[in-house]
Curated annotation (Swiss-Prot):
Family membership noted in the UniProt record: Belongs to the WhiA family.
One Pfam family hit: HTH_WhiA
Single GO molecular function: DNA binding
Keyword Zinc among UniProt keywords: no
DNA bind region: 272-303
The protein's role, per its UniProt record: Involved in cell division and chromosome segregation.
Gene name of this polypeptide: whiA
Domain of life assignment: Bacteria
Keyword Cell cycle: yes
Swiss-Prot/TrEMBL GO biological process terms: cell division; regulation of sporulation
Keywords on record: Cell cycle, Cell division, DNA-binding
Gene3D superfamilies xrefs: Homing endonucleases (3.10.28.10)
Record-given protein name: Probable cell division protein WhiA
Length: 303
């Protein structure tokens, strides 16, 4: 599973969003058609779970029953494309979400109310990412988050919305549309917090810290750095076990004293056992830290 898919699947397991989220989804992945002299709405995605999420969203909000269709792509990836197809109540949905002007090319940016309200902005960013967002796998060491828009003014409004949350968002125009993007790891982690993907934010940060620790090892050129590398190397097994726990039962399932040690070990892979002991809110002995780390390793081994 790609990191992008992981983020999106975390988002759809949160409580159902509001009209601002749905407006962003439809604006970025929806299209209008005309059949039997009435409008129909098609919303496309390559993720079956997202298709079911959109289906339920529309069904609950408008008491209408859409249809889910799919077809196979003919390119090398051969992914299925799922379409949430709405035949009834399309005019009501467009009016309620203030999208009619957008589809007819009259107003392709973001509603001023969304840009001025933080809660509306968070919901809109969540919907935009679900519809047209991607994150480069943090394991690559090259950090990039992108959201694709058909219209440049929408991409620029997205950047403005992100900048409201102190993110260094930029836009670039392509022949087929425009992209709003983030390139700093800290901005991407903050974006994940803004849209509610807390678990993926923790995973992203853990991977980033591990990469930085490995890079520190590779740059070890003197005795002092070599000692740090030795400490980091010794802590890798525990850090990997902590990540395993985060990905399965969640760090919050551990007793608080184990959570504190685990968080410190991931945040500071270069810390010696004594430094971990000293950094705790209520300092304990080295043997106490070792005892807790052994408990963490055993929990991970038993998973």
């Amino acid at each position: 599973m790609s990191f992008t898919t992981k983020v999106k699947e975390e988002l759809i397991h949160l409580s159902t969003g509001d009209n601002n989220e749905l407006a962003a989804i439809i604006k970025l992945s929806g299209s209008l058609g005309l059949a039997h002299q009435s409008l129909h709405l098609s919303i496309t995605t390559e993720n079956a779970k997202i298709a079911r999420y959109i289906y339920s969203f529309i069904e609950d909000a408008y008491v209408i029953v859409p249809e889910i269709r799919y077809h196979q792509k003919t390119n090398l990836r051969k992914n299925r494309v799922y379409t949430v197809y709405v035949e009834q109540g399309v005019e009501t949905i467009l009016a309620d979400l203030k999208l009619a002007d957008s589809f007819f090319g009259l107003e392709t940016g973001i509603e001023p109310q969304v840009l001025s309200d933080d809660n509306a902005g968070r919901s809109y960013l969540k919907g935009a990412f679900l519809a047209a967002g991607s994150i480069r796998d943090p394991e690559s060491g090259k950090y990039q988050l992108e959201i694709y828009s058909v219209y440049l003014d929408h991409a620029q409004d997205l950047a403005q919305l992100m900048q409201k949350f102190m993110l260094d968002a930029k836009t670039i125009e392509h022949k087929s549309g425009a992209v709003t993007y983030l390139q700093k790891a800290e901005d991407i982690m903050d974006f994940l917090i803004i849209i509610g993907a807390m678990s993926c934010k923790e995973d992203f940060e853990a991977i980033k810290l591990l990469r930085e620790a490995r890079n520190d090892i590779n740059r070890a050129n003197n005795a002092e750095t070599a000692n740090i590398a030795k400490t980091i190397s010794a802590s890798m097994k525990t850090i990997n076990n902590i990540i395993k726990i985060m990905d399965t039962i969640g760090l919050e399932s551990l007793p608080i004293e184990l959570q504190q040690v685990a968080q410190l070990r991931v945040k500071h892979p270069d810390y010696s056992i004594q430094q971990v002991a000293d950094a705790l809110e209520f300092p304990i002995t080295k043997s106490g830290v070792n005892h807790r780390l052994r408990k963490i390793n055993k929990i991970a081994d038993d998973l």
